[in-house]
């Protein structure tokens, strides 16, 4: 029905790296079984799950890291499509936005619940996670 809709799948932390590995492997297989590979992007706070997703997902599948401590260069070396960090991380490291773009990577900021913050990252971040989509559209469309 909504064949152009992107699906963002977050893999949560698990109690052990082995459980994360198993979850990542099963999730990638499920996405393939449902023939959603071209629509799914993965996000995770876990560096272990990140590596397992990158290893198991089809080459070119967008995988983003959420935790905030890795530099764009580190993420690029792992094979990430970009970073997906809280806006406070990018306020501390504003140079990471340009670095990501120079490396051909995308930038997402989360979770923005304030129009001033939306304006701060408008035109700099590629994506914005928010609970206020109508307000975000007003900022972007100005």
Question: Where is each model-derived feature located?
Answer:
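Short loop-to-alpha-helix "cap/lid" segments that border enzyme active sites
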Residues: 1-142
């Amino acid at each position: 029905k909504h064949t152009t809709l992107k699906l963002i799948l977050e893999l949560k932390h698990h109690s052990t790296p082995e459980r994360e590995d198993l979850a990542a492997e099963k999730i990638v297989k499920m996405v393939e079984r449902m023939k959603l590979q071209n629509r799914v992007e993965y996000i995770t706070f876990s560096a272990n799950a990140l590596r397992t997703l990158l290893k198991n997902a089809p080459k070119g599948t967008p995988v983003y890291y959420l935790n905030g401590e890795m530099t764009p260069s580190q993420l690029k070396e792992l094979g990430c499509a970009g970073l997906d960090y809280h806006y406070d991380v990018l306020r501390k490291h504003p140079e990471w936005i340009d670095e990501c773009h120079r490396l051909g990577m995308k930038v997402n900021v989360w979770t923005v619940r304030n129009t001033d913050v939306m304006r701060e990252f408008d035109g700099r971040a590629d994506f914005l996670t928010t609970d206020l989509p109508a307000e975000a559209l007003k900022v972007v469309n100005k």
